Amino acid sequence: VLRLFGGVLYGSVVILCTTSWGSQVINSISPGLVQQHTLYYGLITFFLFMGAWECVKMMKFDPKGWEKWVVFPLIVFVFYRFSKRYFSNGFYFDFNISEILALLLIVIAVVTLFRFSKELYYDNGKLIFTVIYTALPFGFALGLPKFSTADNTFTLEVFFLFVLIWSSDSFAYFTGKFFGKHKMAPKISPKKTWEGFAGGVFFTIILGYFIELYYPDLRGNYMIVGLLVSVFGPLGDLVESQLKRNFGVKDSGNVIPGHGGILDRLDSFIICVPVVYLYFILEKLI
């Protein structure tokens, strides 16, 4: 019951903050109180700081070290740079060298986690990883939707990204449950199978086709977004599983009843957002 309640609560908050329903509900009670883009910003900001807090706790920073005092000011500074662009509608998806470098840093952080994990036992490594793993993906998440303050419109790119992530997880789970035989990463995530992965890819692309069919004005092609989500979503899960394994932690936190922490729920989102953002850049270039 607790898990069901936590899932419904989490899903409802995400839906209300990533569609126009949130501001409609609030403004029906108190007219003109909030605009949808502000709700979305609040959601992403909450996710960022809760996720960063969980990451700091999970990685066990030295209480006497200076790094634990620097991590949050650095995250605030990085996120502030993205926030300025968000409120000025400054995400153009042009080939921007600073954005490409930021995306490359995420790749380096993931490779470090799997191939050079000993670097993360030092507090300076923990500091750099935490900033990259939290501030950059959630910063890029601000750039995905389009909005207008004049008529309070807000597009559904992030809502459908969540839909694809949730659906991909479900498709992979049920396909793996009935047909799974070959383990994908038995030491990191023993329940994942290649058959489940293939089922997740196939059905998520089909779902992306229907999203593209009925919502053609969204950024990008959602069949391609579905493919990216189904491929990189499991990687996000493996990244967080490896992080928890490295530091001997079962759950990242307990903020969502029955579901663990923010990082447990958003592991796929954290990796999928930069990938989709890069796709939007490439699509505009091509």
State where each predicted segment sits.
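C-terminal transmembrane helix pair
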Residues: L243-K244, F269-V275
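Hydrophobic transmembrane alpha-helices of multi-pass small-molecule transporters
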Residues: T204-I205, R265, C272, I281
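Hydrophobic alpha-helical transmembrane segments of integral membrane proteins
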Residues: W69, Y133, G253, I270-I271
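Juxtamembrane boundary at the C-terminal end of a transmembrane helix
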Residues: L278-I286
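Interfacial loop-to-transmembrane junctions
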Residues: N246-S268
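Membrane-embedded alpha-helical bundles of polytopic integral membrane proteins
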Residues: V1-L227
